[in-house]
């Protein structure tokens, strides 16, 4: 279902609440906001960060999406441009091209392929756009489903661009669910030499290791063997607050609402 029931007039009466933003540290640029009006009884929080890690060519985009309350199913779409390369979740192509639904925008999306996560090992999804490679890593839960679709259904006058979309669906078993994603921009393809360089991401794995009402922690493992921990605070956003939590690899201690540490 669309935010605010798809009613523009209702949505115009509300705006998300900014919890914190930091733009001064070039190694960690971040913004965190909360939305409590889009769905009755549902609290949505989203944090977007650009972080720079040693050994990674360009800054990584880290996306935290956290939902709590009266939850049905959650669809988290990734709209992208370019050529699909591969995904770690096996997809089965659909014989026909039927719309995903009848309302709330689903009627305009063709269903091209579907798949389901068999475990919580996480998703990797790669594509090529403007001669550059992109890989998205996403935390998953067993039973999560995925749909690759394309805009353009029920569009007799061809007003919609036929852009691809990758939809991650989860039906939570509790009143809280968290998605953590990383998008890595890496390498390039030369149309002159027809050669690719750096087509594989230097990230090996992404896992959420702690998710409580107060904190979320994710591990980023690199191909080099290095590990970095990203932590978010959800209750206290003061810049001078000292946070301390126990992790399997040791104690993580930091100041402020978010941290990126090597561990």
Where are the language model's segments positioned?
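Accessory, solvent-exposed terminal regions and/or long lumenal/extracellular loops of proteins
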Residues: 23-28, 34-43, 51-54, 139-145, ...
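Short, surface-exposed beta-strand/loop "edge" segments at domain boundaries and coil↔beta transitions
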Residues: 37-45, 70-75, 116, 131-136, ...
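Generic recognition of long tandem-repeat/solenoid scaffolds
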Residues: 29-35, 61, 117, 123-127, ...
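Mature, function-bearing regions of proteins
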Residues: 115-117, 157, 178, 182
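Catalytic and substrate-binding regions of extracellular carbohydrate-active enzymes
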Residues: 1-97, 175, 185-188
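Short, exposed beta-strand/loop patches in secreted or surface proteins that constitute
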Residues: 11-26, 115-117, 201-211, 252
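Polysaccharide-binding surfaces and accessory modules of carbohydrate-active proteins
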Residues: 78-142
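Non-catalytic terminal regions with compositionally biased, polar/charged low complexity
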Residues: 167-177, 183-263
